[in-house]
Amino acid sequence: MADFDNLFDAAIARADETIRGYMGTSATITSGEQSGAVIRGVFDDPENISYAGQGVRVEGSSPSLFVRTDEVRQLRRGDTLTIGEENFWVDRVSPDDGGSCHLWLGRGVPPAVNRRR
């Protein structure tokens, strides 16, 4: 685990590790520089979303995977991964936040215009 400037950030990072350990699932990276690697993260699939109330901001309705940033540093847009029996592609990787980040995913294979060369 990284060194932190304050106790709060260190506590949050420990909590994130615990959450991934208990609630996480395995994902296998199937293309790109990390092809074959297995990472662990908390998968969120908000496919059944109701309308938000007044004053509520919704970040997005795409599936995401909450992971350790160090485990996905070489992952790029268009790389693919499998969670369970379903295939996904990386739409974007959120900035590092205390050693963790979100992978925002698309279902299936990436559109041809987004594929890595």
Swiss-Prot record:
Cite the InterPro entries for this sequence.
Answer: Phage_Head-Tail_Connect_sf, Phage_tail_attach_FII
Q: Name one GO biological process term.
A: virion assembly
Q: Does the keyword Nucleus apply?
A: no
Grouped into one coarse class, the protein's main location is virion
Keywords of this protein's UniProt record, alphabetized? Answer: Host cytoplasm, Late protein, Viral capsid assembly, Viral release from host cell, Virion
The subcellular localization recorded is: Virion; Host cytoplasm
Q: Which terms in the GO cellular component ontology are assigned?
A: host cell cytoplasm; virion component
Where, by residue number, does the polypeptide cross the bilayer? none
Pfam families assigned to the protein according to its UniProt record, in alphabetical order = Phage_attach
Identify the SUPFAM superfamilies for this entry: Phage tail proteins (SSF69279)
Lineage: superkingdom: Viruses
Under the subunit heading, UniProt states: May bind head-to-tail joining protein W and protein U.
Function as written in the Swiss-Prot or TrEMBL entry: Plays a role in virion assembly by joining the head and the tail at the last step of morphogenesis. Six FII proteins probably bind protein W that closes the DNA-filled capsid, as well as the U tail terminator protein of the pre-assembled tail.
What is the protein name for this chain? Head-tail connector protein FII
What organism does the UniProt record list as the source? Escherichia phage lambda
Question: Which gene name belongs to this protein?
Answer: FII
